Amino acid sequence: ELAAFEGKDEALVFSTGFSVNAGVLSVVVGRGDYVICDDRDHASIVDGRRLSFATQLRYKHNDMEDLERVLQRLPQEAVKLIVVDGVFSMEGDLANLPAIVELKHKYNCSIMVDEAHGLGVFGRQGRGVCDYFGLTDEVDLIMGTFSKSLASIGGFIAGDKDTINYLRHTCRTYIFSASNAPAATAAALEALHILEQEPERLEQLWKVTNYALKRFREEGFEIGDTESPIIPLYVRDIEKTFVVTKLAYEAGVFINPVIPPACAPQDTLVRFALMATHTEEQVERGVQALTKIFKAQGIIK
């Protein structure tokens, strides 16, 4: 069902999303190959590429000119894999997948997209960023997790039949790790059915997301280039990030502090993440509480 949902031949299920990236990348590329990553890719991608023994190259976040500069230096006939988050987990912005696909054809590359934060949010019935851009067939491997929109634990990789069969017999994090718990798998499967059968949930998610984006911008928050229900509220001070988180919790607002190593010291933020079950009234209460806190801390005027 996962493979069909993602528009691929087959899929493998892992016990965690982290183990998907760490395991898959360690075996789909190797010595003499090249793996090219956005410098804001998830830590599991970083660990996977290190384990692969391939030459690791990075480009500036969502900078397609820099990606092309990296690709221009590589042999045309070499194995080259571009690995990118579909939605970046801290910033909330999207990978420029149309431009990456153009470069794939120009420089003879393959593409792997991490849909951890795109699944259940973008595309038809929440199929992800690849579907949102209409580029599912151009992406060679699609990775996803059960721990975000599917409200469980686990992960998967979807692709063509031969590649998935190869991974089934070579991927160490799949072979030498316990299978996902039946209850967790069943919960994720039921969540997938809800995505397919209850489109009004996705509509509500985007309704409250667009409302929150508008209100935070009106109040003068720095939220960067987010295009998703992940809304970063930049603090740019480690100590104040913790203070804001504590004060927000006391005010009845749950936010996640993001500090090194998840970001650079000058880029600390709190992450305001939305669900389909939130209402505009709840969002407004959150915006008002955070506006008061951020102003008291001198973060916004």
What kind of region is each of these model predictions?
Residues 1-23:
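Short loop-beta-helix segment that forms the pyridoxal 5′-phosphate
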Residues 4, 250-253, 262-301:
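PLP-dependent enzyme catalytic core of the Aspartate aminotransferase-like
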Residues 24-43:
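Conserved PLP-anchoring active-site segment centered on the Schiff-base-forming lysine
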Residues 52, 106-107, 219, 251, ...:
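Helix C-cap/helix->beta junction micro-motif
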Residues 57, 61-113:
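Active-site phosphate-binding strand-loop segment of PLP-dependent enzymes
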Residues 107-110, 117, 122-227:
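Active-site C-terminal subdomain of aminotransferase-like
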Residues 203-211, 217-252, 262, 266-267, ...:
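Conserved PLP-binding catalytic core of the aspartate aminotransferase-like
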